[in-house]
Amino acid sequence: ASDVYKRQDYTSTTSPGDTTYYVSFNSGNDENDGKSEDKPFKNLGKINSITFNPGDIIKFKSGESWKGYFKLRGSGSEDKPISIENYSSGNKPIIDGDGYQAAVFIENMEYVNISGLELTNQASHKFTNGSVKLMDQSSRTGLDLRFGLLVLRHGSGNIRNININDIKISDIYPTPNNSDNNHQGYGIRFESLNDDNVLNYYNGIQMENLDILNTGHYGIHIVNRMSGAQADYYHRNIVIKNSKFTDNGGSGIVLARCKDVVVENSEFKGSGSGKDSRMWNRGSSLWTYTCN
């Protein structure tokens, strides 16, 4: 697996769109153009430095692994989403968040498809020299909160069509100073924030063929942080299907301020697990509150 590389180590560029990029840690080079299997990029920092556009596809090579975080930039369109996939044969490519708050971070983006990856994240939130690992020099750390995939919305406007398929997520735990926060590890979280009471919501979340196991808290958490938000601002049109939730320290799925939700053909085993001392050790298979 790679060392941690950040986008600040690279010159920022913008993709023209409708372009496929390949990433291989074992055979790649960040001096390549990344546009063929023969000349792939190498590091997460390189693709973190690119702003993608509609029709772009980012492909990670199967059987390989990276340490650090992948923060996707740019948005797709209704007819041309941005897609994250794998290529070649073998096991799913692994992104190990290595103590950053999230292995994959999507912020204020829409029309995105993610498939065919494996995510994990339980290493220390500090480098060996004691400095804290920060995503893009933000205040977000993996100290008290940790995610496999974090999808975040703040500011005005709604987010449409985020599709997640065939993803494995396991071993998501923070490294807090206070052991009371040991359990704050989540497989996937969709979250909208209350910025000066500007209301927003997700419209169109589809997740299928997921395998989420060994998280400190919830497997999937979809939440709207708007204080007093009415049902007009609930997240909506959410489908979760054909998925497995195993030994999550809290509930398998938790939905808050959501409506028009379908959960089907999914399996829950060991919800509320305490088999690891970092787990919450309390939870149900599926829990909803303040939902329609």
Language-model segments: residues:
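Short, small-residue-biased leader/transition segments that mark boundaries at the very start
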Residues: 1-5
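Right-handed parallel beta-helix/beta-solenoid
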Residues: 6-46, 62-64, 87
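Loop/turn elements at helix/coil->beta-strand transitions in domains of secreted/extracellular proteins
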Residues: 17-19, 53-57
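Extracellular beta-strand-rich solenoid/capping regions of secreted or surface-exposed proteins
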Residues: 45, 49-54, 65-83, 92-160, ...
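Extracellular beta-strand repeat scaffolds in secreted/surface proteins
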Residues: 56-60, 85
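Short, well-ordered beta-to-alpha junction loops that form the rim of enzyme active sites
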Residues: 61-64, 222-223, 255-257
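Right-handed parallel beta-helix
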Residues: 81, 85-90, 110-121, 157-173, ...
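Short, flexible helix-coil linker/hinge segments at the edges of structured domains or between repeats
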Residues: 178-185, 272, 276-281
